[in-house]
Amino acid sequence: MIRYPAVAGQFYPEGETLVEMLEEFFRDLGEQGNSRKITAGVAPHAGYVFSGYTASRTYKAIYEDGLPETFVIFGPNHTGLGSPIAVYPEGDWVTPLGKVKIDSELAKEIVKLSKIADLDDLAHKYEHSIEVQLPFIQYIAEKAGTDFRIVPITLGIQDEDVSEALGRAVFEAAEALGRDVIVIASTDFMHYGSFYGYVPFRGRANELPNMVKEWDMRIIRRILDFDLKGMFEEIREMDHTMCGPGGVGAGIVYSRLMNAREAELLHYTTSFEVSRSTDAIVGYASIVMRR
């Protein structure tokens, strides 16, 4: 089974332009590490011109800490297709940088242990939130001279129970199979403005990005504290438009079980820095969790 790119040439460029963009994002890449303390990372999934640099901070940290055998990548299901909790079963994902192998053994074990997920490829066919993460991983893996596999999981249902079940299933599956795993939660934060039908506050154009950040930081602080319940409470209280809380929650649960002790916000920005539009402002954050 092969999954071909759905958004190459749209969310990110193809060919040499993609390589040049990645090289620019990673121009400050440090030495390859081998401490393997990172358990999970959070990265955005907008077009690279908006959020690519922020996403690169997560993968820079992973490169400098050491790459795992497998990345379990959670992304929200924007298309509504397929199973509400869909684990891609087997085969390869293709990007302009080449093929990425699915860790099918781990995928099946996660489905078995979670009791709520399905093996399903349809949910992934046109979804961009996981696809856009792969060129970053391919780039750092090539630099490191290492192979890796992935388990892509899309979420159409996102709540505490789903996060708890999936985070625990990833941990138990990795333990059972002896896998070294990092969880990646693909998410953007607040989607503000008339374009999204979400205007919980108003202000001058130059004030709005900071106001978006203030609201996002209420959630980010909960993430940095590994506070799953508190994160979802903040989201409900604000009716917040973060699109991937379920994956972030799974990363929190997995990291707790891996005895993670610290989390760090590496970078934050908004789409306003590029677009200068107040009709649609989206927050982006890079976060890593470490044991």
UniProtKB/Swiss-Prot annotation:
Organism: Pyrococcus abyssi (strain GE5 / Orsay)
Record protein name field: MEMO1 family protein PYRAB05390
Superkingdom of the source species: Archaea
InterPro entries: MEMO1_fam (IPR002737)
Gene3D superfamilies per UniProt: LigB-like
Protein family according to the UniProt entry: Belongs to the MEMO1 family.
HAMAP family: MEMO1 (MF_00055)
Family matches, as CDD domains: MEMO_like (cd07361)
Pfam (any one): Memo
